[in-house]
Amino acid sequence: TMIPPLAYIATPQEMDEMLTSEKPKLALDNFWLERTGSIERSKELIRIYYNRTLFSNYYFTSYKAGWLTDRGMVYIMYGPPDKVYKNAEGESWGYKRPPVKSRWGSRYTYEDQYLWFNFRKQKSLFSDNDFVLNRAGTPVSYWDIAVARWREGKVFRLDNPQELR
């Protein structure tokens, strides 16, 4: 169903209400309408959120559905990464942050900075597509801000400076 992937942005109470509702589709629609206040905006948010979920299921499924994996979680919340590095041990995903303006003498320079998520490949009898997020390696992830933006009916974008306030 479409309700379980909302676990990243819905409260436990909201999840319980939607999952136990006699009319789950109506409960799901109301969840999105409460976020946006507009049918058109809700449709757009639903399209983006569930396209990311579909992509996660297609590319990141291991012994569990892709949206339940660490890579799926990050992809759903942050979208496609700006940079990806892969090796035998794992993957690193980089999301571009707003450029930092620094002054050197009379010149200003802009430096690109990235938020990195590092995934370590797990050995598994059941799948060769199982990766675990190194949570200690990402001290600032803006997770709470990302959740808040989705709950406000907005798609979170890390490269937008207004998003980080």
Regions found by a protein language model. Name each.
Residues 1-165:
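Residues within mature, well-folded domains
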